[in-house]
Amino acid sequence: MDTELLKTFLEVSRTRHFGRAAEALYLTQSAVSFRIRQLENQLGVNLFTRHRNNIRLTTAGEKLLPYAETLMNTWQAARKEVAHTSRHNEFSIGASASLWECMLNAWLGRLYQLQEPQSGLQFEARIAQRQSLVKQLHERQLDLLITTEAPKMDEFSSQLLGHFTLALYCSSPARKKSELNYLRLEWGPDFQQHETGLIAADEVPVLTTSSAELARQQLSALNGCSWLPVNWANEKGGLHTVADSATLSRPLYAIWLQNSDKYSLICDLLKTDVLDGQ
């Protein structure tokens, strides 16, 4: 049996709501419904009664619940034990490409400089979309996530690392937004709410990317503008703020599992300022 089906069943039974379960699992509501149907088909029973917004476990669902919890706990314990034997000196950090390029690469360098030679700690710098990294963190495939959005799941702990400033940049001085094409650099779903009020409603990006370096290199060729971190843009040089634009402050969070067996190491690593110079 697919453990993902059991995990989805447990989340729906906990929230009694397909939409909230989908949000907690970082899935679409249709994906949650599909998984529940798959599980019901495998077992040959209905697990939930659905009447408008009132979702309840059936008798079969109530009987399955303790077994599903035991199976998932056993599976998680097995994964943790196997992972521990092969990863005791490894530490994985996940973030988007733009965060690695603009600030985390320098932080990683400082971490290596501060490590004791005998520690033997091996870092893995993992680049992926936030949704994928959250799933990896939840499944103990990732130790630490650095992101611009606070966690939405109860089993996650987090620390606000600080804030950094974004400005709208182009490749030549004294340009206005109306004269430029928009290059969308992905800073997370919640950033799109701010973005909507800062660009024209009918503005269609000529390029969408998760890489700040790629966006920077395309500004001149595409006669474009993009939201870039101020300190990073100043270091790169050759960039100019768009004349009729504002600046935005973005938070940066470190997120990890509450019961992570690497909690003490996480605390030690976060003593080194991630936003040093930002």
Swiss-Prot record:
SUPFAM superfamilies on file: Periplasmic binding protein-like II, Winged helix' DNA-binding domain
Family matches, as Pfam families: HTH_1, LysR_substrate
GO biological process assignments: negative regulation of DNA-templated transcription
DNA-binding region: 18-37
GO MF annotation terms: DNA binding; DNA-binding transcription factor activity
Claim: Repressor is one of the keywords in the record: yes
Superkingdom of origin: Bacteria
Keywords: DNA-binding, Repressor, Transcription, Transcription regulation
Domain HTH lysR-type: 1-58
Matches recorded under HAMAP family: HTH_type_HdfR
NCBIfam families registered for this protein in UniProt: PRK03601.1 (NF002946)
Record family assignment: Belongs to the LysR transcriptional regulatory family.
Function: Negatively regulates the transcription of the flagellar master operon flhDC by binding to the upstream region of the operon.
Protein name, per record: HTH-type transcriptional regulator HdfR
Originating organism: Salmonella newport (strain SL254)
